[in-house]
Amino acid sequence: MTSRRTRLRLIERLRKNGIQNEAVLEAMTEIPRHIFVDEALAHRAYEDTALPIGHSQTISQPYIVARMTELLCSGWKPKRVLEVGAGSGYQTAILARLSTQVYTVERIAPLLEKAKLRFKALKLNNVSAKLSDGRWGWPEQGPFDAIMVTAAPEQTPSELLEQLADGGRLVIPVGSGSEQMLKVYKRQGAEIEESSLEQVRFVPLLGGVVR
């Protein structure tokens, strides 16, 4: 159930659901999702559903991964990408295939250590990762051409908007409980354009670090 054929069936399902960016679909074909979940769940890795990864966190539904990546990377190859919430590392790995350098922050140490081992196994040499409260971003490495947030704050953190480079994009779920909206912010000089796209469901973006 983890064969390339199984992976390709998922890709065709994503196409039918409206994902059109070929670079995104190719990255999701090449990155094996089953290595980002526990072995007991590997047989479900290519279902279009979120799966638990421990510590009350999930690996996102493939459609959502594809949709957010398409919004972030469509029409260009960002050089510097910040990801807030590495989780299993799956979304990070997809971004690494579509950008020059990915900086990812994760607040739960055991998840981050597992993710780093997966990056090494996949020879993803363009990923830098650190244990941190993601709400603060990674200001020492900014500004970023693109920022993706994989957990939902109640409001968009101003610190992340400040780390967005001119011409850059931020893709983020915003809201609490079941009232979350997927938003895209685009910076043009001092102006930031905000778009609300569709309802989504993510774990909340929490503060602090768990060791």
UniProtKB/Swiss-Prot annotation:
One of its GO terms (cellular component) is cytoplasm. Its EC number is 2.1.1.77. The keyword NAD does not apply. The keyword Cell wall biogenesis/degradation does not apply. It holds the Pfam family PCMT. It is found in: Cytoplasm. Keywords: Cytoplasm, Methyltransferase, S-adenosyl-L-methionine, Transferase. It catalyses: [protein]-L-isoaspartate + S-adenosyl-L-methionine = [protein]-L-isoaspartate alpha-methyl ester + S-adenosyl-L-homocysteine. The active site is at S60. GO terms for biological process: methylation; protein modification process; protein repair. InterPro entries: PCMT, SAM-dependent_MTases_sf. GO terms for molecular function: protein-L-isoaspartate (D-aspartate) O-methyltransferase activity. Belongs to the methyltransferase superfamily. L-isoaspartyl/D-aspartyl protein methyltransferase family. Catalyzes the methyl esterification of L-isoaspartyl residues in peptides and proteins that result from spontaneous decomposition of normal L-aspartyl and L-asparaginyl residues. It plays a role in the repair and/or degradation of damaged proteins. NCBIfam families: pimt (TIGR00080), PRK00312.1 (NF001453). HAMAP family: PIMT (MF_00090). This is Protein-L-isoaspartate O-methyltransferase. The lineage of its organism: Bacteria, Pseudomonadati, Pseudomonadota, Gammaproteobacteria, Oceanospirillales. The gene is pcm.
